[in-house]
Amino acid sequence: VTTVQRQPNTFDAVVHYRFLTGDEADYVGMARSYQQYLIERDELHRVEFSNPNMGVRLEFLGGDKERVALWDQFIPMTTIAQMSDILGSLDIPNPEVIYYGWQPYGASNMPPTSLVLEGGLGSVNDLRALADGVKASGGHFSLYYDPQKAIAVWGENGYSIRSDIALAITNATVETFNRQYGYYFTLDALRRRYQPLVADIESQLGAGLALDSIGFMLYSDFREGHTLNRQEAIEAYQNLLAGSAEFTGWFSRAIRYLSA
């Protein structure tokens, strides 16, 4: 079994040491020191808000599936109509609304490559009206999506475990656990799924995607003929997301200044 990478990755590694003393020698001081480092590199900028009302993030679970005998059935948790009623009763200005588990059979099912909603939640027209209402109140509406993850459920449709899943240097599948167990897609499979979905949501819904993981998660792929190291993954993700930067929201750190 190969456990040592024969060809080293090509990149310049730089290590910065910062020594903290006195009141700054704690985790808060570390955060401030790193903040100052990003400011000095022109990577971090102060955002001025013209609206005094800070938006509140609200995440709704559409639903999920459960096994019944030999098939799955969808269990709705929050339909589009219910979500609209909740938002109306809260009457919060500038809400940041994220809808999780919107796809057919819900959160534990692979998202499609086009905008297809679970019928038990409502229609695309219903969702468009809701998104327009959120936007009119000064907020943003997004569908939750983790583009890197292939949900690992036996018999799951939508991808090939033989060709679409990234491999470690030991030829084992690269695994993850984020809300549910899964694998990581190869870059080709990620592109093939992400790009048409973005285009379809933009044309049909005019809303956004709340992207999980890809803003901070890097992994190498040693699949023969498709090798990709983490340094190369940064550039690939930057190029992939560049065309939809205003349309997508990253849950965590911006990958723009990360390095492997």
Feature locations, PLM:
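Conserved structural scaffold segments of CAZyme catalytic domains across common CAZy folds
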Residues: 1-139
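Aromatic- and carboxylate-enriched substrate-binding clefts and catalytic-loop regions
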Residues: 94-260
